[in-house]
Amino acid sequence: MILLPFHTRRLVSHVYCGLKPASQNKGIALEMTRPSSNLANFREAFAKAKHIAVITGAGVSAESGVPTIIGAGGYWRKWQAQHLATPEAFSRNPSRVWEFYHYRREVMLTKNPNPAHLAIAECETRLRKQGRKVVVITQNIDELHHKAGSRNLFEIHGSLFKTRCTSCGSVKENYKSPICSALAGKGAPESDVQDAKIPVEKLPRCEENGCNGLLRPNVVWFGETLDSNLLGEVEKELEMCDLCVVVGTSSVVYPAAMFAPQVAARGVPVAEFNMENTSATTTFKFHFQGPCGTTLPPALARHETELIS
């Protein structure tokens, strides 16, 4: 038996988003044991749970055909996401960054929720009628959970389909395709494609009266702080949950990498559904390996003890 220390200061003090290894700072020690893959035992815990927190990452959307931009092969042209998704990159070359996000927006407009998204949304709707709660905390910016029907939803890294004005701060939904005429036909990801070098005045602009400021995607970039109010709400949900389900997350991006280990530290069952083990897997009670579109639906299906309404 090995003990792994995890830092457990309040989440709102860990509001930086970036790729870095799991914390090894001193804190509450989590007992590391081999997690169970017994579905029947998980279903017993699921049947008893009144407040379920579902934490999702890029893996849940990969089965919808969404390109993963973190990890092996995660390139757009010759840049990795962490070299484009930064305030510094936008300041240096807003045209290139907007091409990158325009490409991602156009791709996402063609994608649909997969069985994992749908299982989570159906579970939320079904359990709500029983006076039980399911909340989804996602690192994804693709809005597929929303499209699937999830309503108790925290998009902690923002959305591809919202913009924020760099001048007045106005945040608006935006599903235009293309988002501006200058980006039409731009954004191809191949490494030999040259930058469009769009003049800044032709990039997406704010339509608030008298503003006309440059818009940026309303997403959290590497090195930026997350909304402390939003994280406060997330923390409340994690403190109240009596079951935590982790789906398709690599457990390397903070602060989300802390969420499930923090829940496990107070003795709440945590079930991980993932294609492979992560640095946090051995701190969880359950682990189900394989495509989440296959493993998750039977885990969240109606339990025999549920009343049919």
Swiss-Prot record:
Transit peptide: 1-35
Subcellular localization(s) per the UniProt record: Mitochondrion; Cytoplasm, Cytosol; Nucleus
GO molecular function: histone deacetylase activity, NAD-dependent; NAD+ binding; protein-glutaryllysine deglutarylase activity; protein-malonyllysine demalonylase activity; protein-succinyllysine desuccinylase activity; zinc ion binding
Documented EC number(s): 2.3.1.-
Superkingdom field: Eukaryota
Domain Deacetylase sirtuin-type: 36-306
Principal location class: mitochondrion
Xref: InterPro entries: DHS-like_NAD/FAD-binding_dom (IPR029035), NAD-dep_sirtuin_deacylases (IPR050134), Sirtuin (IPR003000), Sirtuin_cat_small_dom_sf (IPR026591), Sirtuin_class_III (IPR027546), Ssirtuin_cat_dom (IPR026590)
GO cellular component term of the entry, any: cytosol
Signal peptide range in chain numbering: none
Cofactor comment: Binds 1 zinc ion per subunit.
Cofactor: Zn(2+)
Catalytic activity: N(6)-malonyl-L-lysyl-[protein] + NAD(+) + H2O = 2''-O-malonyl-ADP-D-ribose + nicotinamide + L-lysyl-[protein]; N(6)-succinyl-L-lysyl-[protein] + NAD(+) + H2O = 2''-O-succinyl-ADP-D-ribose + nicotinamide + L-lysyl-[protein]; N(6)-glutaryl-L-lysyl-[protein] + NAD(+) + H2O = 2''-O-glutaryl-ADP-D-ribose + nicotinamide + L-lysyl-[protein]
Ligand binding (substrate): 101, 104
Catalytic-site annotation from UniProt: 157
Pfam families (alphabetical): SIR2 (PF02146)
GO biological process, one term: peptidyl-lysine desuccinylation
Family under the similarity heading: Belongs to the sirtuin family. Class III subfamily.
Note on domains (UniProt): In contrast to class I sirtuins, class III sirtuins have only weak deacetylase activity. Difference in substrate specificity is probably due to a larger hydrophobic pocket with 2 residues (Tyr-101 and Arg-104) that bind to malonylated and succinylated substrates and define the specificity.
Entry function: NAD-dependent lysine demalonylase, desuccinylase and deglutarylase that specifically removes malonyl, succinyl and glutaryl groups on target proteins. Has weak NAD-dependent protein deacetylase activity; however this activity may not be physiologically relevant in vivo.
Name under which the protein is recorded: NAD-dependent protein deacylase sirtuin-5B, mitochondrial
Species for this entry: Xenopus laevis
